[in-house]
Structures are given as C-alpha cells and as structure tokens.
Design a protein with these regions (language model features):
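A short mid-domain helix/strand-loop element embedded in enzyme catalytic domains
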Residues: 191-223
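C-lobe/activation-segment region of protein kinase-like
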Residues: 288-331
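N-terminal chloroplast transit peptides
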Residues: 1-30
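N-terminal mitochondrial targeting presequences
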Residues: 1, 33, 37-55
Length: 368
C-alpha cells in the first residue's frame, strides 16, 4: 500500500449520556426496528430481482477510471486522484481478497461508496471524517490527510478464513492475538467476551498483525494518537453494532483508518462498515446455525473467500479459477441487499449505457 500523504478512498461497554442522546435523536434512521422492517419490506426488491439485475450488468462493471486530473493512485478497489488539499476517491467494481484480484462485481463500487457515506453521516457525532462531498454514486471527495500507517481492525466474534484471521490463529493454538488474550474452549463464529482491536500495519507487500504496544515501540504512531484512534474505533464499532442490530444484522468485524488533516484534526477516512471492509451476518438465524455447527448466513464477501479457499490455494496458486457468473451475481445481490437493509433505501441501479468517466467528470464540476 502506498504511504503517500492522503486519505485512501477505500468495547465500549457503557455509552456516555451525550452518546445515548445522539442515538435516540437518530430514531428515524437508527432505531424503531419494526417500522424500519415494514418500510424495507415495501421498498426492497426481492433477491431474485437483485440477482437478475446483476446478471444483466456483468459486462458493464466499473473496472477502472480516468478522470484526467491530479495524480492518480490505483489501489485494489479504489482509484484516488490527488489535487491540492483535496482528493477524489473512485470506488470501482473490482473485487479483491487474499491480497489479489478475484473478480468484477456489478454495482459493488456504488454500493460501497453510498454505504460508506451513510455511515459517515451516522457517526460524525462520534468522530470527524474527511468527507467533503459525494457528487456521484461511485465518487467521494475528501480532505487530504496524512494517513496513519495502521489499519484498526476491530472484532466482536471469533471468525475468519484468511491466513491472518483470528479464527485461523486460534484453531492453530494461538491464545494471544495482537496483545489480546483469548480464552480456551471457544468455537468458530462465537461471540467474544468483549470487542477487541487487532491492528495491522499498512505495508507495500503484505499487512501484518501488530500489538498496540509494538505500534509505539516500532515507531508507527505516537501513543497519544494511537490512544485516540483505538478509543474512537471501539466507540464507532459499538455504536454501529447497535444500529445494525435494529436492521436484523450482526456487525461481526470491520476495519477503520484515520488520518490527520492540515489543521491537525484526526479524521476517519477511507471507508466505513461496508461489505468489503466488514463482515455482516443475519441475526435471526445466527443462534440456530451456531448451535448446529453451521456457518452463519453471510451478507458480505466472506462466502466468495470461502468459494476460492475450497478450490485452490489463493495465496500460492499463480492462476485462480474464474468465479462463475452466478456466484458473481449472488455477491452483487448480497451487497445491494445489505445496502438496503442498512439504509432502508432502494438501491438505484446505474444506467449501463452511460459513459461512466464522463458521468463522474460532470458530477465533479463545481465541487473541486
């Protein structure tokens, strides 16, 4: 990952009185679950329709961008354009996992970008963010920030499928992960006694897990900045878990990134609580499936990870099997479903005949 100085477009057990008040004030968007479900039932297309729309758009994915200004940095999913004190993040339909590209997923970029913007607005009472404007479904304009070289991964459950996942570490006998002590006798997908932060470094080749103590010891961050980011990570995550619960969802884990702007303010950057950066499970079936030793009903990219992991070694094999169209459409459908469950809004399918780059350039006029 690049360490350039810009924001890449990509458990608190008790709330304070002000936080509780803020949560109550957002009743129309974050509580009143029964009302939300009734609205959602009327507004959301069924799964078959979502999947059909995705199948029709497989050949019209946003695979790259060309906005024609500033310095361009191409990441795994986002293209970033830096110009002056602002940056533009274009979220594409590229799908990555295991540190490599896997497929293109219809509508993924728009879903991720719009999901992030919804969460940024919902959490700005907890921590400031870098968002300036969202002029296009795939585009966000952000303040330019100096990015802290640490990803703040936060977990509420013992799960995962990658080589660096908490579950992989645990099943291989590890009982300390990034400085967090883990109890014996736990099983996969079990809820942890409390949310934990398990940071990773942001490096060019491979990120690596690191303890909070080593972050300071190795000079990645100053203690004061680290303490602030850890506290905000736990606070935002706990709040988001409560919101997700009112939508029939379990927010399992996620990652947050922070940066410092020109005025010295530490801001939440990149993306927040998206199906790319997070795991979500359906809550109504979790207990029953867990009791039977079954995987939870997943509504994120984890099932795509599992598909590849069952058919190859995605870390070592030079050539990976091609994800079938039905699998790609299913993931797209799940992403859209998650967006609609979280926001209560119907996802608007972008017109496939539109020149995406022209659309984005026009949307940015008057914003930059």
């Amino acid at each position: 990952m690049s360490n350039a100085s810009f924001a890449r477009p990509r458990a608190l057990a008790v709330r304070s009185k002000s936080q509780s008040a803020a949560l109550n004030q957002r009743a129309t968007t974050t509580t009143r679950a029964s009302s939300r479900r009734s609205v959602l039932a009327r507004a959301t297309p069924n799964d078959a329709l979502r999947k059909s729309q995705a199948m029709e758009a497989i050949d019209a994915c946003v695979t790259s961008s060309d906005l024609g200004f500033g310095e361009k940095y191409e990441g795994k999913v986002r293209d970033t354009y830096v110009d002056g004190d602002k940056m533009v993040a274009v979220t594409t339909d590229r799908q990555s996992a295991f540190d490599r590209h896997l497929a293109y997923i219809p509508f993924k970029g728009a879903v991720l970008n719009q999901t992030s913007q919804w969460w940024f607005k919902q959490t700005e009472h907890i921590v400031p963010n870098a968002v300036v404007a969202t002029p296009d479904p795939n585009v966000t304009v952000m303040r330019r920030c100096e990015v802290f070289p640490i990803e703040f991964v936060v977990r509420g459950y013992l799960t995962g499928s990658t080589s660096t996942s908490l579950w992989t570490h645990y099943k291989n006998g590890g009982r300390n992960y990034c400085g967090n002590e883990l109890n014996d006798g736990m099983v996969k997908n079990q809820k942890l006694p409390a949310n934990i932060v398990t940071p990773t470094t942001k490096e060019k080749e491979h990120d690596r897990p690191i303890s909070l103590a080593d972050i300071v010891k190795e000079g990645w961050m100053k203690q004061e900045d680290l303490d602030y980011c850890v506290a905000k990570t736990l606070e935002v995550f706990a709040y988001a878990q409560e919101v997700a619960a009112t939508r029939g969802l379990i927010l399992v884990d996620t990652k947050y990134e922070f940066g410092r702007d020109a005025d010295g303010t530490i801001r939440l950057i990149d993306e927040i609580n998206t199906p790319d950066s997070s795991r979500y499970w359906l809550s109504d079936s979790y207990a029953e499936r867990q009791a039977k030793g079954m995987e939870p009903d997943m509504i994120d990219k984890e099932f795509l990870r599992l598909w590849f992991a069952e058919r190859c070694d995605p870390y070592k094999d030079e050539v990976l099997p091609e994800a079938p169209a039905d699998l790609v459409a299913e993931l797209s459908s799940r992403y859209v479903k998650l967006y609609e469950m979280i926001t209560g809004e119907t996802f608007e399918v972008p017109a496939s005949s539109t020149d995406v780059n022209e659309r984005m350039r026009n949307a940015l006029k008057g914003v930059l």
